[in-house]
């Protein structure tokens, strides 16, 4: 799960903390169901953008539901595929929540990030980086694609 509270400063932090608390309290279920759970329970905040992803290793897919300007990408064998995040603000205005499934292959990277990163990054500019630890991929994206005047969050995970 990745979230970004709407706005800046303490009010945005309240929204982000509420998302984290509700995510921890949510029943283990599909990404869509978890996102619906969070949406209903953070209405007292100014809202957030939220992405929830779940690996299904048996089916070799990732299930994903996202609302707002969260960038979500699967990188497999050098090919980048965007995952769909629908418009809206969790806790306030959404037209619906949908869950999508995306195929994964061995060594696929799943990258989620907030709008604090420019989404025009290209892992091909860093030969061999995709084979390194996910934390190094995340740190490199944060360093080189981070917007200096915005907070940023990055989540990178790898399949095996």
Predicted feature locations:
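Conserved subregion of the PPM/PP2C metallophosphatase catalytic domain
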Residues: 1, 6-160
């Amino acid at each position: 799960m990745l979230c970004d509270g709407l706005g800046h400063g303490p009010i945005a932090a309240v929204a982000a903390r509420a998302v984290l608390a509700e995510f921890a309290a949510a029943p283990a279920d599909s990404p869509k169901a978890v996102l619906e759970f969070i949406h209903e329970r953070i209405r007292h905040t100014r809202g957030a953008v939220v992405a929830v992803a779940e690996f299904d290793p048996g089916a070799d897919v990732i299930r994903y539901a996202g609302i707002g300007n969260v960038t979500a990408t699967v990188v497999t064998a050098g090919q980048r595929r965007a995952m769909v995040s629908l418009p809206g603000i969790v806790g306030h205005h959404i037209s619906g929540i949908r869950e999508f499934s995306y195929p994964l292959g061995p060594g696929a990277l799943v990258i989620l990030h907030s709008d604090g990163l420019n989404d025009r990054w290209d892992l091909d500019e860093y030969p061999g980086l995709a084979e390194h630890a996910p934390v190094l991929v995340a740190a490199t994206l944060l360093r080189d694609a981070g917007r200096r005047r915005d907070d940023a969050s990055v989540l990178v995970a790898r399949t095996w």
